Amino acid sequence: MTVVLAYSDRTSNTVFMAGDSCASDQIYQSLIKNPKVFHPVGRRDILIGCAGSFRMLNLMQHVSGIFPPENELATDDIDMSYLVTEFTPVIKAITEDFDEDDPWEMLIAVGSRIYRMQIDLSILEPTDNCDAIGIGGPVALGAFKVLNELAPYKSVEERMKHALTVACSSCKGCSPPFMFEHNEDIPREILNKIPKKRDKKGYEIIRHDIDVDESKADVSLEELLSNIDQKSSKHNGNKDSKSSKDKKHHNRFKQKKKP
């Protein structure tokens, strides 16, 4: 019962990850301090997000040697081949005593690439530059993609926060506060960098409870409603005028028919 969202920002060549703070079962839920997104021991260039079993989360966060140190294994050498042939046996070993009540999945960010590892030890790499796991994953992923299209002027953190908020409002088992991480030590101004200028036209469809800078919109709500009222009044006026003309024509026709 979790939501973890990952996004690869191509402008800064960095992966950002965010997760919720909820622990729950079918009846109860509580907030926890354990981060669901973190760096494995000794590797600031790698980022991991876990959903499902908290035992898996504990092991991935605190057991050393899951990934060799950077002086033994460079970031560029960690690719799909390495994860399948070298990383997968390590995960298989530490999950040998897991049972069916310990389901899990994880996101692994290396460099600017995102991988998803599933409970059967299969590894997937999405074609999109984002992915999400957990009960709220599909909702968060959909909301985030919409925000990328409609609100690219918002910072990465703002877009991720909005997407996670939508997931938590729609799915039982995930809840704020949200924890954010990135797989490099980059300045805060890069984290909040506007990725590109807004070039969209038309009306934006964004939830009214999300802060939106109306100065960047193509038309304000008041202007839109005013235009609708004006068109409606003009249309009704034309109908009344046409009705009056038809009535006069009908009366003249009746007068001519009289013997």
Regions found by a protein language model. Give the residues of each.
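Intrinsically disordered, low-complexity segments enriched in small/polar residues
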Residues: 40, 50, 171, 200, ...
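Long, low-complexity, intrinsically disordered segments
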Residues: 219-259
